[in-house]
A protein has these predicted regions:
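Nucleotide-activated donor-binding/catalytic signature segment of Leloir-type glycosyltransferases, i.e.
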Residues: 240-264
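Glycosyltransferase donor-sugar binding loop
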Residues: 36-39, 203, 228-241, 256
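Conserved acidic donor-binding segment of nucleotide-sugar-dependent glycosyltransferases
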Residues: 315-325, 334-340
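Carbohydrate-associated surface elements
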Residues: 159, 172
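Conserved donor-binding/catalytic core segment of Leloir-type glycosyltransferases
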Residues: 4-6, 194-210, 216-220, 229-230
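Nucleotide-sugar-dependent
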Residues: 13, 210, 259-266, 271-296, ...
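N-terminal subdomain of nucleotide-sugar transferases
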Residues: 1-47, 75, 102, 152-154, ...
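A short, well-ordered alpha-helix in the C-terminal region of glycosyltransferases
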Residues: 190, 334, 341-356, 362
Length: 377
């Protein structure tokens, strides 16, 4: 049986969730990821993933119609999984379903409209009138009214479950690969030029809703000379945050995007993983995938009480108020002053991840849904 996973844009981090589902199913089924690529390339961290990826050109309307036709013609699967409530994934999947009667599983891991709604009035108006963009607001807004046409729906947090219903499947991780016992923290620190340093890590692309500004403000308040902020997977936009720092600029180390399979190596260098999410429409309907990376690697995690984060951590992390850089700085200091407590929280977080959020969990749930769809045909 062949499973085709549609990704709305292969060139950005939306490929992360699509890749996760593909890896969960690859041991049981023939799996392929397909979709358009806005930049023409594959998102770097998953460029070498051991799953076939078929990429198509991204164009503006009306020229994108030819891409849609090509994708629909090329799909030769028994089951479609559409990642994200987007027209270039779910929309295309529905057209293929109506043409060929192929069952569609809709995977929703973000509230897509939340990313559009955080702007002001005129920003919303401008985005809503952007009809030439295949992934634009008008078509994304329309997709919410078509969720009932999916044969099955899975969601990544309770906000989305309350809004769209469906089965709740959190981001999961392969805890056998993300295993701290397989990595040497000191040697990785030495490799990064951080020998004898205490490291606070931020994973992923810096964005305002991720609390990047609060993290830099917190670093300004920390006077301990051996503490460093290591940003892994950052792009060029991070430089403006560094330039705006009043002090401690020399304590910030930036690593560009890394391949997904190297993530455990870099994460092993962290003493603390910081995920200071803000409370915005961007974050209310999502749960950060890096939360599960940190849990799997038994890292002490500082984060905020947004979305399902407290439930996922189960008390095995450090929760602060969103937007509070003072509290973030104090919590960093507290963790370094209480290493044994932090170590135990990290270990318990890993145990929780192994029990509830291992890749086998998502494999079992997806396989169950696929069997139901194929036996009812």
């Amino acid at each position: 049986m062949k499973i085709c996973i549609l990704c709305f844009d292969l060139s950005n981090n939306s490929l992360g969730r699509a890749g996760l589902l593909a890896m969960a199913l690859a041991s049981r089924y023939e799996v392929e990821i397909i979709g358009p690529s806005k930049s023409g390339d594959i998102w770097f961290p998953m460029k070498d993933i051991d799953i076939p990826i078929r990429s198509y050109p991204w164009k503006r309307y009306p020229f994108f119609v030819s891409t849609i036709r090509k994708i629909i013609k090329d799909i030769d699967a028994d089951i479609l999984i559409a990642c994200k409530l987007r027209p270039t994934s779910f929309g295309i999947a529905l057209i293929k379903k109506w043409v060929s009667n192929i069952p569609v599983i809709l995977d929703i891991d973000d509230w897509e409209l939340g990313f559009f709604y955080h702007t002001g009035f005129w920003g919303k108006v401008g985005r809503f009138l952007n009809f030439s963009n295949p992934g634009g607001l008008p078509y994304t807004w329309l997709m919410e009214y078509f969720t009932g046409y999916a044969d099955s729906t899975i969601v990544s947090n309770r906000f989305l479950k309350n809004k769209f219903s469906g089965s709740l499947i959190y981001h999961c991780r392969d805890t056998s690969k993300l295993n701290p016992e397989n990595f040497d923290t000191d040697s990785m620190k030495a490799k990064l030029g951080l020998k004898d340093k205490r490291v606070v890590m931020f994973l992923g692309t810096p964005r305002p809703h991720k609390g990047t500004e609060e993290l830099f403000r917190a670093m300004e308040k920390i006077r301990e000379p051996d503490i460093r902020l290591l940003l892994v997977g950052a792009d060029s936009s991070i430089q403006r945050y560094i330039d705006n720092m009043k002090n401690n600029q020399d304590k910030v180390i930036v690593i560009p995007q890394i391949p997904f399979n190297e993530l455990p190596n870099y994460l092993s260098a962290a003493d603390i993983l910081a995920i200071p999410q803000r409370d915005t429409t961007d974050t209310q309907g999502q749960i950060p995938a890096k939360l599960f990376d940190g849990m799997a690697m038994a890292k002490p995690i500082i984060t905020t009480s947004i979305s399902d984060i407290p439930e996922v951590l189960g008390g095995h992390g450090y929760l602060i108020e969103p937007g509070n850089s003072e509290q973030l700085a104090n919590t960093i200091k507290f963790i370094f002053a209480n290493p044994e407590e932090a170590r135990l929280k990290g270990q318990n977080a890993r145990k929780r991840c192994q029990e509830l959020y291992d890749l086998k969990v998502i494999e079992k749930e997806l396989t169950s849904q696929i069997k139901k769809l194929t036996t009812t045909q």
